[in-house]
Amino acid sequence: MKVRPSVKPICEKCKIIRRKGRVRVICENPKHKQKQG
């Protein structure tokens, strides 16, 4: 899980979702998981 000021999709399978007011990226590739913080 990467914590970044700006989250961007890295590949085509990355999805941007909002959970509890936080922006997250979920993906098949665990290295692509990100959250904004």
UniProtKB/Swiss-Prot annotation:
GO terms for cellular component: cytoplasm; ribonucleoprotein complex; ribosome. One of its GO terms (biological process) is translation. Pfam families: Ribosomal_L36. PROSITE patterns: RIBOSOMAL_L36. Disulfide bonds: none annotated. One of its GO terms (molecular function) is structural constituent of ribosome. Keywords: Ribonucleoprotein, Ribosomal protein. It comes from the Bacteria. The keyword Ribosomal protein applies. InterPro entries: Ribosomal_bL36 (IPR000473), Ribosomal_bL36_sp (IPR035977). Belongs to the bacterial ribosomal protein bL36 family. This is Large ribosomal subunit protein bL36. It comes from Carboxydothermus hydrogenoformans (strain ATCC BAA-161 / DSM 6008 / Z-2901). The lineage of its organism: Bacteria, Bacillati, Bacillota, Clostridia, Thermoanaerobacterales. The gene is rpmJ.
